[in-house]
Regions:
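Conserved beta-strand termini and adjacent loop/short-helix elements that scaffold enzyme active sites
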Residues: 36-38, 97, 131-134
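Anion (oxyanion) recognition and catalysis
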Residues: 88
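Conserved beta-strand-loop-alpha-helix hinge of the TIR/SEFIR fold
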Residues: 59-85, 93-103
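C-terminal interaction surface of TIR/SEFIR-family domains
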Residues: 4-6, 105-142
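A short acidic (Asp/Glu
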Residues: 18-19, 78-81, 106-108
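Conserved nucleotide-binding/hydrolysis micro-motifs of P-loop NTPases
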Residues: 12-14, 101-104
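Flexible, active-site-adjacent loop/turn segments at secondary-structure boundaries
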Residues: 50, 77-78, 115
């Protein structure tokens, strides 16, 4: 069964890597959301926060899975956090993939980034349960 997947990533730093990950699925029975023309993102990011949130919410519509592509500077970014929070709120499955070892357009890799799931938790039986305990992360294998 095909699932529509939203990809969350640090656009400026990891767009090339994210595109490579997306293209690895081309022959698979999957649909991807969260990939957009760079000119579109350049226009969107000029808008105010409420317009950006609306745009992200529209990208998340119809998705059931959110894959957070974790690069060196992904964790703690405002829009990554919003995408994680929104995805969890709409009960999307979440999955983290470290992409620091994937080469960028210049052939360079980067340092492993902090897991953004470590910033988020739910309360269960009066105890914090961090997203790192709820959602798996993996390393991208070239």
């Amino acid at each position: 069964m095909a699932r529509k997947t939203f990809f969350s990533f640090h656009f400026k730093q990891d767009n090339w890597r994210a595109s490579q990950v997306r293209n690895s699925w081309v022959t698979q029975d999957r649909k991807a959301a969260g990939f957009f023309d760079s000119a579109e993102w350049e226009e969107v990011k000029k808008k105010d926060n409420s317009d950006i949130k609306k745009w992200i919410d529209k990208q998340l519509e119809g998705t059931s899975v959110t894959v957070v592509l974790i690069g060196e500077k992904t964790a703690g970014r405002k829009w990554i956090d919003y995408e994680i929070e929104s995805s969890h709120g709409k009960k999307n499955g979440l999955l983290g993939i470290y992409i620091h070892n994937k080469k960028d357009s210049d052939g360079n890799t980067s340092n492993k980034g902090r897991n953004p799931f470590s910033d988020w938790y739910i309360t269960r039986n009066d105890e914090k349960v961090y997203f790192t305990e709820l959602y798996e992360t993996y390393d991208w294998v070239n």
